[in-house]
Amino acid sequence: MRRIVIKVGSALLSRGHEMAMDRMESLCRFIAELKQKGDEVILVTSAAVAAGYTALALDKRQLPNRQALAAIGQPLLMNLYHQTLAPLGILPAQMLLSAYDFDSRKRTENARNTIEVLLSHGVLPIINENDAVATKELDMLAVFGDNDRLSAHVAHYFSAEILLILSDIDGYYDKNPCEFPDAKIRRVVNFLTPEELEAEVSPNNAFATGGIVTKLQAADFLMKRGQKMFLANGFNLGDARSFLLEGIHCQGTLFVQGGES
């Protein structure tokens, strides 16, 4: 039995000013397939702000408004997950975490104990950062970078075998594919340079706060602790499905400590 953390961001779960329900449904079916195979799954999700905006169109450029949208949107987001997962026979559970929860050994232990109970009963833990109070993320300073680094902490402290980050790109390219048509996906990465980890963070879209850099920082965090991360396209789950369900590496990038594959 594997324990897998899946992270999905706002760029995938929203389309314009609406929620992308077709993508959420595809994600939930994929999770159901993994669970049917016997895997334990923890989902780290963004998009509370995006969900809130569907109910109240506040100016997202103002931090208090983004916090308010997160407060409005989190229950809406969980309701969408509940409606989508129920026909698949999956019961979801919400957990809101922050950087502080991983700075405190006691709080980390409490969260871990909760996760263990949920997984032991077949429940799907759905984790988001507590955006209504996590001002740094909403202020685009990205404590966890649209939950990229949060998902790495979840994978590490909750003993996952691998973190799957579903993104709006096919993997980690050797150069910017928007500028260089000959850019190629790096299939396996064993090491990341300081230059790669310190580049400027750029948002994916109006709702997202992460970028490729926060994903690399998540990968670096896990590799240094002997754990793996797989970066794949979330618009089409074919590569993620092949890798995790069939053990076939088509596209996508596997980040793993040197020498492994």
UniProtKB/Swiss-Prot annotation:
Keyword rRNA-binding recorded: no
Cellular compartments annotated: Cytoplasm
GO molecular function, one term: glutamate 5-kinase activity
Ligand binding (substrate): S46, D131, N147
Protein name: Glutamate 5-kinase
Organism: Wolinella succinogenes (strain ATCC 29543 / DSM 1740 / CCUG 13145 / JCM 31913 / LMG 7466 / NCTC 11488 / FDC 602W) (Vibrio succinogenes)
Residues involved in ATP binding: K7, S167, D168, T209, G210, G211, I212, V213, T214, K215
Family statement drawn from the similarity comment of this UniProt entry: Belongs to the glutamate 5-kinase family.
Enzyme Commission no: 2.7.2.11
Keywords: Amino-acid biosynthesis, ATP-binding, Cytoplasm, Kinase, Nucleotide-binding, Proline biosynthesis, Transferase
A single GO cellular-component term on record: cytosol
Function: Catalyzes the transfer of a phosphate group to glutamate to form L-glutamate 5-phosphate.
GO biological process: one example: L-proline biosynthetic process
Pathway, per record: Amino-acid biosynthesis; L-proline biosynthesis; L-glutamate 5-semialdehyde from L-glutamate: step 1/2
